[in-house]
């Protein structure tokens, strides 16, 4: 098995958009159910949501600015590391993600193995 990162972008019902609402609770349950199924199948490795605030450090002068400055539908809300046999398998795993119910998207990226 190889490791892949699923990067979650956009979505209308992220916890930071709908905290305390019925939509947020329903959305969170869908995510938990999906991730639990990945755990049972041996695909789940790790995950963390991201807060919508941050800083950017840019260029050779290392200029720091508030960020991220992206369109809402491109905001990275979190990521998930999965085990999959290949990228096609990882893409199939991503298709079960609840973010598609929120008009979001998933970027699937292979994680490069590194010797330390």
Where are the language model's segments positioned?
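Conserved, structured core segments of small domains
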Residues: 1-116
């Amino acid at each position: 098995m190889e490791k892949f990162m699923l990067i979650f972008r956009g979505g209308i019902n992220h916890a930071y958009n709908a905290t305390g609402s019925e939509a947020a609770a329903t959305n969170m349950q869908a995510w938990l159910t999906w991730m639990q199924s990945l755990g049972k199948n041996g695909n789940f490795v790790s995950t963390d949501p991201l807060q919508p605030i941050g800083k950017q450090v840019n260029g050779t002068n290392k200029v720091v600015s508030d960020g991220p400055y992206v369109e809402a539908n491109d905001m990275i809300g979190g990521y998930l590391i999965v085990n999959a046999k290949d990228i096609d398998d990882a893409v199939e795993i991503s298709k079960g993600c609840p973010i598609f119910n929120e008009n979001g998207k998933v970027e699937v990226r292979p994680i490069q193995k590194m010797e330390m």
